[in-house]
Structures are given as structure tokens and as C-alpha cells.
Amino acid sequence: MIKNQIIQNIKKLKSDFSTNYSIKTKTEIFTEKLFYTLFDGNALLDESIEELEILFKEISSIACKKPNPICDSIWDKYLATLPTVLEKLNQDAAYILKNDPASNNLEEVYLAYPGFYAIAIYRLSHELYELDLLLFSRLMSEYAHRITGTDIHAGAKIASPFFIDHATGIVIGETTVIEKNVKIYQGVTLGALSITKEMKNTKRHPTVEEDVCIYANATILGGNTTIGKGSIVGGNSWVTKSIPANSIVTNTTTTEVKVKEKK
């Protein structure tokens, strides 16, 4: 009797839920399959693309809020973006190889770099975002977030080439704009200065111009904040105002070192 009552209570509380949880699992499978298709030299493209199309349409049937004929046509639009996305990702990988002394070859970047994986899934999810498949894109980017510890919103606009090193703890908000040849290290936040629901559809996150390097744990906030071309933002810096081109931003907190006295 108690069990039946509990079940009825749960049903009542769930009565307004329309969530189809399978979309999350399907998106994760799609994401891995898509990455494999683009970067595994042994992938059979014809078969892989067909499998991806089936998965995509299953997901979009849940995620797409438009009439069915429009939803069904989105796959062709998404597929058409993949060569351009792959070209950008190859540029990203080459830029990582060029700038990271610990890297040995492109194969290592493709297989072992969480920063590259985070960039790849960002670029692939961004195209979904542009096609207004917002839930699909969010689930894809959150999967990469879970795998790499890097949170890049699919709505951000990031030029190529782009370099992320170590990846862990990086946050890049929805309205961030990053120009080409930018390097970012672990723990960097490109975020909003304040958050209210009324700020939706406004520029809330920074702009980073080309040839900028942002070192570990720097925090840059605000939609009106621009990091000028060629600047360097030092580790642990806190930036809420624009800085001009070719600036060097440093955290002035000093670290004191003392030698312990021998007893």
C-alpha cells in the first residue's frame, strides 16, 4: 500500500515532465561517432555518415521544436558544414603542435590533447547552435565539458587557429568572441560581470582580439571588455575593463619566500 502511494505521488510530481532522457545518451554516442569519423584514418566514411544521419535524426526529432519537414532537412545543412569545420580543426591542431614544446606530432594532438578535443566539440556543437538546435548543441558541449573539464558554450564565436593548453577549468561564455591566434591556459574564465535573466540576448562576455595569450587562472569579465590585439594577460589576473593592444597585464600580488631556520 505504501509502495503504491509513493508511485502515485511520483507520477503526480512528474505529470508536467516532457523530458526524454534518451536524447542525452544518443547525443553522447553521436559526439563520439562524429569525432571518430572526422579523425580516424580507418573510418569508413560512407558507412559512418549514414550511421550519423540516423542518430542525428533521432536526436533532432526530440530536440527540434520546428515542424517535421524543417527538422528533417537540418541534417543536410549540418552535413554541409563539416568540411569547413574539419579545415578549421586541422588549423587548430597545427597551431597546437607549433606552440606546445611537449607535443611531438599531429597524431598525438588528435588522440591525446583534451584541449583539442574541447575545441573540436565546440566547433561541431556551434554549428548546431547556429541551426537553432539549442538543446542538441548544449548536450554536446556539456559532454565535452564532462570529458575534458573545459566549458565552452556552443554560442561563443571562436576563430581559427585557437590554442588551449592543459584545458582543465577553462570557462568560455555564450557571447564570448575570440579572434585568431589566441592561446589560453588552464583555469581561464571568460565570463559575465553580472548575471540576470534580462541580459539574455545581450553581449555579456569578453572579446579577445587576435594574437593574445592568456595565462593560467586569469579571469576576464564583461561584455564591454576587450583584450587588445597582441596583449599578454598574466596568470591569476582579474580584468573587468578593456585593455589596449600590446598590453601586458600582471597580478601585482607578491609571493614571499623565506628559508626555514635549521634547529
Locations of the language-model features?
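Left-handed beta-helix
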Residues: T148, H153-A154, A159-S160, D165-E174, ...
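Non-transmembrane, interaction-prone segments in cytosolic or luminal domains
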Residues: E108-V109, Y143, D151, I227
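Residue-level signal for pocket-adjacent positions within structured domains
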Residues: N104-L106, H145-I147, G234
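Terminal amphipathic alpha-helical/low-complexity segments used for targeting or macromolecular assembly
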Residues: M1-E142, K263
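Short, conserved active-site entrance elements at the starts or edges of catalytic domains
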Residues: E130-S160
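Extended hydrophobic/aromatic segments used for targeting, binding, or gating
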Residues: K197-K203
